[in-house]
Amino acid sequence: MLYLHIVPVWLNVCLRISSSVGCLCCLFLKGAAKAWILDKLIQRLRFFMDLSGNKDLLDRELVAFFASRKATPHDTQLALQWVESICQTDKVVISGFHSPLEKEILNYLLERHHPAIFALGRTLYKKVPPYLQTAFDEGNLLFISFRGYSRHTWNSAQQRNWGAADLADEIYFTQFDNTSSLSTLYFALDRYSDKVVRVLE
């Protein structure tokens, strides 16, 4: 379990450094080797998933959404246009729904009874929050927890984001600055993943 806690922290530190000057590990690894290591580390998160809700949603095409806490009105507009287009499809949005804009996207999905996967940065809820109960009862919601954290922390948030990205077929970000942990996630996925990875702009 300790290993699982360390993984997202190590990935963030290592990949952030390698994006600029290179770390000791990354200096000796080619792109394919980095991609293989990244894939193996993230895949391990799947063995620690707890699920509650409609598990069949995992069999659908998943799109991950990540938004910075510093999202601008323009970011919000682009995100709402994006989620509107998603609601015209059978795709399922997976996200931590933690930042203000991510919460707004969740509300949009709930209002339209569109399915979503809520990746938690903590253990599963003992009781479904009232505002999510209808979606849960309708089979439009699945909670995922990557275990080990009784409450939300920075480390658990990183673990949650990496895990959600691993499950997704496509990954979308709003704009972020270089100090954001989303920068590290985007850099790793864009360079070493064969998934669709885009920034809304």
Region spans (language model):
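Glycine-biased, small-residue-rich flexible motifs in mid-sequence functional cores and linkers
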Residues: 17, 22-201
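Short loop/turn and low-complexity linker motifs enriched in small/turn-promoting residues
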Residues: 2-3
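Short hydrophobic alpha-helical segments enriched in small aliphatic residues
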Residues: 6-7, 13, 21
